[in-house]
From Swiss-Prot, chain A:
Cofactor section: FAD
EC number: 1.14.15.45, 1.14.15.46
Protein name, per record: Ubiquinone biosynthesis monooxygenase COQ6, mitochondrial
Annotated source species: Dictyostelium discoideum (Social amoeba)
Record key words, sorted: FAD, Flavoprotein, Membrane, Mitochondrion, Mitochondrion inner membrane, Monooxygenase, Oxidoreductase, Ubiquinone biosynthesis
UniProtKB/Swiss-Prot annotation, chain B:
Residues given in the record as Mg(2+) binding sites: E211, E214, H215
Function: O-methyltransferase required for two non-consecutive steps during ubiquinone biosynthesis. Catalyzes the 2 O-methylation of 3,4-dihydroxy-5-(all-trans-polyprenyl)benzoic acid into 4-hydroxy-3-methoxy-5-(all-trans-polyprenyl)benzoic acid. Also catalyzes the last step of ubiquinone biosynthesis by mediating methylation of 3-demethylubiquinone into ubiquinone. Also able to mediate the methylation of 3-demethylubiquinol into ubiquinol.
Protein name: Ubiquinone biosynthesis O-methyltransferase, mitochondrial
InterPro entries reported in the protein's UniProt record: SAM-dependent_MTases_sf, UbiG_MeTrfase
CC cofactor: Mg(2+)
Localization terms from the record: Mitochondrion inner membrane
Alphabetically ordered keywords of this record: Magnesium, Membrane, Metal-binding, Methyltransferase, Mitochondrion, Mitochondrion inner membrane, S-adenosyl-L-methionine, Transferase, Ubiquinone biosynthesis
Listed Pfam families: Methyltransf_23
Residues that coordinate or bind S-adenosyl-L-methionine: R102, G135, D157, L210
Amino acid sequence: MLRLINKTINKNDLIKINNSKRFCSTTTNSTINKDNIYDIIIIGGGLVGSTMACSIGNNNTTKHLKVALIESSKIQTVEQSISNAIPEIRTISFNNQTIELFKSINVWDTIKSTKRVNPFNQVRVWDTSGFEGIHFQDNDIIDDGNNTTAMGYIIENNIVTSSLLSKVKQFENIELFEQLSVKSMNDYNEETIRTTSILPSVTLSNDQQLHAKLIIGADGGNSILKKQLQVPSIGRVYNQKAVVCTLKLGIKQDNNNNSSNNNNNNNNTLFQRFLPTGPIALLPLANGYANIIWSTNLMHAQYLLELDDESFLEQVKDSFLKSPSTSNSSFFEIASNLFNLNPKGLSGNEIYLPPIEGLVSKRASFPLRIDHTFNYTLPRVCFIGDASHLVHPMAGQGVNLGMADVKTLSSIIEQSVQSGYDIGDAMMLKRFEEIRKPENLKMLLSIDTLFNLFTNNSIFVTGLRNFGMSLLNNISPLKNLIIGVSKGESILKFK
Amino acid sequence: MIYHLISKSCQRLNKPNLINNLIKSQKQSIIYSSSSSSGSSKFISNKYFTTTSNSNNNSNNTTTTTTTTLRQDEIDFFNQQSSDWWNPEGTMKPLHRMNPFRVKYICDRLKIYNEKVSKNPIHLPLEGLNVIDVGCGVGLLTESLSRLGASKVVGLDAAKNNILMAISHASFDQKLNENIQNKSLNYLESTIENFYNIENDQQFDAVCSLEVIEHVDNPKQFIDYLSKIVKPGGSIFISTINKTFLSYISAILGAEYIFRMVPVGTHHWDQFIKPKDLESYFDSNNCQITDLKGLVYNPLTCEWDFTNDLNVNYLLHAIKK
């Protein structure tokens, strides 16, 4: 123990030596001076990281904190992000809680001003069993400028990110490190950080060294920080890929509904069909575009990527509208009659899908997995967003969970400042973990269960599933509850 | 001599970890006294040691001297607890969780009653204030007060191990380390009466004594001393546990025996105090209670919250006229 103390003292001496060296040598990268000590370093300037930065900068209690935001890619301006009329391939479904957060940090107006924001108020979910499926419908979208009641919003990733980062640039205490990544964590040692006044530091790809009281890892599912610190996590690979692309939709010939006010922009329904190979979803975008996210097995994904545009479109239409195959289901029919699984005898064609005009983007794909980190925090380190919890995109909740992390962590940091705590205080960070972990795990497990349920084709499971769905579809309080959940509202309130 | 004392007390406690911690804190306090000038070493010298610090022999001392507000067994108890005190998941977890709430309460109240505080920047509300934390333990509240910018903070505790742990812990934080060096943060091993007798010119803008008075033998006298060291117009903050049936159920049976949140023997119900009694003590010292607020703990979520129910834990703010 005594030796340990000696060691610490030596380290302190070393720092002093380094400091004195500064005056006689030109290599100043490894020295600690006031300039490279930050209160908070946020690694990753994506949706979650940049919202975190805005959230700190926009709060009167925390705006004095010196923040470094490190983003590895080149940052686009808002103008650049909307320069292409065709929407970007990566789109996100934001729930109302996230929109509220955007409003509170004053970026919602910027995002809305791009006119590339599309609210949706209907969700149609069905599967291949020929059953009617489930139809969620919220109130009509009322937009009086301040209050919009929609179930959620579909917006392109880069529009939101660039709006957030343009806001970040307005805060004087936030420094943006563009096109730089984290090279190393410089012998980060939990024990040393916990029991001495030595702050952790990161070395950037340009060999610049930054020290901070708190390092926030917001660098996504493949977090470099997590790898550097060898933080363990569990999860599984779904053996699936999501194939994504952008479509242009045709104009609806909806004669029955002439009285509707928003005939021009009737693109407010989110469609999702659970195929035996995985879910396919059509997310409506502004200006008559739509985004397809098609999760399927690796072979099929490869096949879909290699098809020419026309055949691919055929496949998309088929997958949404094709009747259930009855070839192998004589037993299914018996069971179906017995349990009255399909009382209306629907084929699936009744689901009204907007006409698809054409493909306007290349197809891309990304692998799907679920992952959860047990420790959201280490001494003076905290993970938020996909860095600590990764989900299947089928429920569109990944980013929204990350935003809920941001909300909680910023209020914890605010409390730390108000109550005279170090912002990297272990107990305060632990409180963040205690609040967020149950919420995130709940969502992770629900989505994983849904995935298992819907990719299962056994009669028992389909029967159960459809029975459940028909129940759901006919019991309105229950349905309202689910709409509430999908909007991100908490059902159980303890206070 | 100090070293000898500690190792002796550690042997008595039969805790091998404790001795290491203490050697460490001892070592660090030596670093302080040697690195800074004689002024800082004053605080860890024997000047403030009470007669009770040589604990083995004179445990009867307290009953014979009229000026002592503390019982020796209480000091011994907290001497034992000091090693695990700074562990936020340890035996003092509820206290750790309570701290952010009580700090916020203190700042909010001072904002109303102290002009300086209302004009200070949000993150340094206590700038320009002299504050004392009587019964600081290992410095939970003291550290917060120092970080919030108070120009002078004194942490006072009669248990020597607590003071050593407090000094050691402050060295983990660069800002607090600086504050100790420039003497805006001071830890003293002393009882309130000794402190008053030696430094009777000290006048504080705020006197805090949180979760302390229920461990004090003579609360009336304790309040007398607190009122003596506060400036006219200054604030006194007390938090404690009410003497009710419910407080017996929750603070003794619940917290110590059922949930095992705090060590058995932490509290003694007969030493709990009713707000009414405190009011009369304050009255006789020309102080007025301006606010009373209840605090409630949820053992499942480990979170505190404010309430209007004063039956168990409560906080109060008094002003000296």
